[in-house]
């Protein structure tokens, strides 16, 4: 089962843009605050967020590198900090990689990942259709079926804006995602009321009066809602 979150928007030359559009060489690319109707959809998986589709097409690896989007740069969305970057898949075909790990965790269904006829750049040079096919192209290569599927990796929440009692939050970690009203917070736990979402593993547990307690150490990211 995949959990999807809408977070942030794509900007081209500082203008909010739709996703799945053709890139014009030379445009400045960034991911920033969400604009209604132009939000990016992300799959919550393995303590990170991976775009559920290519958000730009006909873009080269060199174009992405010129915008510091290959190996990662820091962005702030909704008061929280992330590194936005390409996925890591390893230099050899049989090496463990983040894409395979994501497919193993939530499944390969095209309705989740929109991978059919939509290849994407990764950090490493590779060696085509199943969801796990990989190949290689020169860094300057551009094609309408080859695009930019970013990943967001949450940074340490201790350096983010203060979270206050009474705020409506969405918290995620692993494959778990929950939202609710923050009732209590400590160095070790958060307690939410009026919550909904999906719990897996040791992320959290249900307590009295329809509340849940979340292990602070299991939280990978947060969003005010």
Question: Model-predicted segments: where are they?
Answer:
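GGW-centered surface loops in extracellular recognition modules
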Residues: 1-52
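C-terminal, surface-exposed recognition/capping segments
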Residues: 1-12, 55-57, 69-188, 194-197, ...
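A structural signal for short, hydrophobic beta-strand segments that form beta-sheets
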Residues: 31-42, 181-184, 194, 219
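Short, exposed beta-strand/loop patches in secreted or surface proteins that constitute
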Residues: 39-42, 161-163, 181-185, 204-205, ...
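Aromatic- and glycine-enriched beta-alpha-beta binding-site module
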Residues: 44-48, 52-66
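Short coil-to-beta-strand transition motifs
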Residues: 50, 172-179, 211-216
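Extended Gly/Ser/Thr-rich low-complexity repeat segments
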Residues: 59-71, 207-210
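Intrinsically disordered, low-complexity, charged/polar segments
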Residues: 199-225
């Amino acid at each position: 089962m995949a959990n999807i979150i809408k977070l942030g928007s794509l900007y081209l030359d500082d203008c909010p843009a739709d996703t799945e559009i053709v890139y014009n060489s030379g445009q400045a690319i960034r991911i920033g605050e969400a604009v209604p109707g132009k939000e990016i959809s992300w799959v919550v998986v393995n303590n990170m967020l991976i775009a559920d589709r290519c958000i730009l097409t006909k873009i080269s690896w060199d174009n992405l590198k010129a915008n510091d989007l290959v190996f990662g740069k820091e962005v702030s969305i909704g008061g929280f900090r992330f590194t936005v970057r390409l996925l890591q898949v390893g230099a050899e075909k049989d090496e463990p990689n983040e894409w395979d790990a994501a497919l193993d965790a939530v499944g390969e269904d095209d309705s989740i990942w929109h991978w059919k006829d939509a290849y994407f750049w990764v950090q490493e040079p590779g060696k085509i259709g199943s969801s796990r096919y990989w190949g290689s192209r020169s860094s300057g290569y551009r094609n309408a079926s080859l695009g930019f599927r970013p990943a967001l990796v949450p940074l340490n929440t201790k350096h983010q804006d203060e979270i206050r009692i009474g705020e409506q939050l969405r918290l995620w970690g692993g494959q778990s995602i929950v939202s609710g009203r923050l009732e209590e917070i400590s160095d070790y736990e958060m307690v939410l009321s009026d919550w909904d979402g999906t719990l897996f593993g040791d992320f959290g547990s249900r307590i009295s009066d329809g509340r849940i307690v979340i292990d602070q150490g299991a939280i990978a990211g947060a969003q005010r809602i």
